[in-house]
Amino acid sequence: MPSRQLQILIRKTLPLVPDHVLIIGESGIAFSKATNLLGQEFEHILFDGRNGIHLEALAIAAGTLKMGGTLCLVLSDWENLSQQPDQDSLRWNGNQSAIATPNFIYHFKQCIERYHFPILREESAVEFPTVFYSNEHHKNATLAQQQIIENILQAEQDIYFLTAKRGRGKSALLGMLANQIQAPVYLTAPNKSAVHSVIEFSEGDIEFIAPDELALTLQTEPEFSQSAWLLVDEAAMIPLPLLQEYSRYFQHIVFSTTIHSYEGTGRGFELKFKRKIHRTFQHFELKQPLRWQENDPLEHFIDDLLLLNAEDDFQHFDYSNITYNIEENAKNLSFPCLRGKVPEGPKGDLDIASLPQALEALLTSKGSEGKYNRQFFFRDFYGLMTIAHYRTSPLDLRRLLDGKNQRFYFAEYQQNLLGAIWALEEGNMADDELIIQIQQGKRRPKGNLVPQALCFHENLSQACKLRSLRISRIAVQPNWQQKGIGQNLMQAMENADVDFLSVSFGYTDELAKFWQKCGFVLVHLGEHQEASSGCYSAIALKGISKEGLALVDTAYKQFQRNLPLSFHPFAINFEQNQLDWQLDDFDWMSLKNFANFHRTLFSSIPAMRRLLKLAGKENFPLISAYLTKKQFPINKKKGVECLRLEIKQYLERGTL
């Protein structure tokens, strides 16, 4: 049986293709809808990459291609591809317009060359031969699948982890397992359309429940989980708090997840999950591909292109009590193309520097001796990020390679990357009118996540004008954690020519204590829990310059002043000094922006409560009723409009 193939076709227009060829892109399945293709198989696929390469969709296409099939990637140019604006950059770069992505294109072309895939110029050269492969022989369990099923059915452990790369028969195993369990079986997954293989192999004798609905049902009808089994497909894509909730009710659970996939679900998920849930575990992994041949060139190409093996290839280094120096150079340079070597540094030193600056040194180094091949150093950096953040995804890879306004700091000791920080430059906005519109909620331009949040939610417009560095990711080798590496990396950042440092994170007590230990103060808690983590978003700041220190001090005092008067669930977790009921300039700004523009109700509640305290509830019957019941008699949108009008009418009267 022939291997699956990738062909690159260089054309300004899409070629005409037979009906049995699936088109992904402008004239077919939208890139954003590609996840709905998971679990299906297609003979041939035409991928429209003329305006940019959507990496996740490309990986999905490769994962759904049948054995012997052809994936044709259409590009508008080849020789000048690195100079063309990539429309996909609008998803991951903060700019308002598309940018060229020379570093990714260099990496992409290297991978194409490595696997000798053809570059075609004529439409007639593309071939979509009939594929005679059938997966009927995989309807029965393989030996590896049957052994895992038998082990799970013995039910000697509480929780089972099943991992596999795509195309290994993981979904089929879940379905066949459900057939043999002599108890009720429930299935949940983040995407119902992707589990039809599980349902097919279970012969329909399994009930699917969406993750949120399952959690709600467990809270209202906990008895339904008694004696039942739960199968969780693509578990790493479901927030950990929900998985923890499931584990409190079901005696036996099988958590299944794809490793080395477009979703960015690394092996770190299992380790992180085990630290959260204290139950007995057993892990199984399917390794033999079933839907294509061993050593399939297309699979290897996707693995290399998306650096899917970077996590496994990362070299862990045992901790030793070394004496090291800290060097900091945060000159912001563009990420060079990946070639060359890193010059040798002083033996035994721990070097912390801006990654682009360090990689710039690779280009200018005249010596041939070096401790790192740059391609491998880049893989190490990405691998370390994947270990620490199991949802590191192809989107992050694209941003890492070509994103603008980035700075990278790393700790390295004798050819081993110990820790790293990935930071983004923010602020330094000069358009006063735009800043006013951000504060009013009229505009939300791309980028500047923390400055815009502080401006809109906390009325701190100065945050947009000052220069700041936001820590996007921080990672330290597992063996070197709790050794001060992370704090030392952040100390090096303090030499940057900015006014303050910031970080946005999913709030947990553990993370809050870590950032506090690093000198940051909490200044914002989001209204809603993040879907990805189940945590409330939080913002913490650390002042650097005189202006930055003043901003952080104001932000912290406002946060401490307003949180006790908010309805945030965490308000009771923080020390509450004497409540401040006096209306200040920030409060009046909040009220005006709520009444006349788009300030949120949640952010305005402290100011509204102070207004009612001083002006009397009789002037605000609607607001008083809402603050008492914390709900609207009508739908929320109309209810908020009524509250805005009540505040607006009062402000227009100009009386207190």
Curated annotation (Swiss-Prot):
Q: Which SUPFAM superfamilies match?
A: Acyl-CoA N-acyltransferases (Nat), P-loop containing nucleoside triphosphate hydrolases
**A Gene Ontology biological process term:** tRNA acetylation
Subcellular location per UniProt equals: Cytoplasm
* CDD domains from the UniProt entry: NAT_SF (cd04301)
Which Pfam family is an annotated match for this chain, by its short name?
Answer: tRNA_bind_3
Binding-site residues, acetyl-CoA: I474, A475, V476, Q481, Q482, K483, G484, I485, G486, Q487, E510
Q: List the catalytic activities from the record.
A: cytidine(34) in elongator tRNA(Met) + acetyl-CoA + ATP + H2O = N(4)-acetylcytidine(34) in elongator tRNA(Met) + ADP + phosphate + CoA + H(+)
Q: Disulfide bonds, which pairs?
A: none
User: According to the UniProt entry, what is the EC number of this protein?
Assistant: 2.3.1.193
Q: Which residues form a coiled coil?
A: none
- Swiss-Prot/TrEMBL keywords: Acyltransferase, ATP-binding, Cytoplasm, Nucleotide-binding, RNA-binding, Transferase, tRNA processing, tRNA-binding
- Determine if Cell division is one of this entry's keywords: no
| Nucleotide-binding keyword on record | yes
Q: Where is the N-acetyltransferase domain?
A: 368-542
The record's section on InterPro entries has: Acyl_CoA_acyltransferase, GNAT_dom, NAT10/TcmA_helicase, P-loop_NTPase, TmcA/NAT10/Kre33, TmcA_C_sf, TmcA_tRNA_bind, tRNA_acetyltr_TmcA
The protein's job, in short, is: Catalyzes the formation of N(4)-acetylcytidine (ac(4)C) at the wobble position of tRNA(Met), by using acetyl-CoA as an acetyl donor and ATP (or GTP).
Q: Which family does it belong to?
A: Belongs to the RNA cytidine acetyltransferase family. TmcA subfamily.
This protein is called tRNA(Met) cytidine acetyltransferase TmcA
| Species of the source | Haemophilus influenzae (strain ATCC 51907 / DSM 11121 / KW20 / Rd)
Query: What gene name is listed for this protein?
Result: tmcA
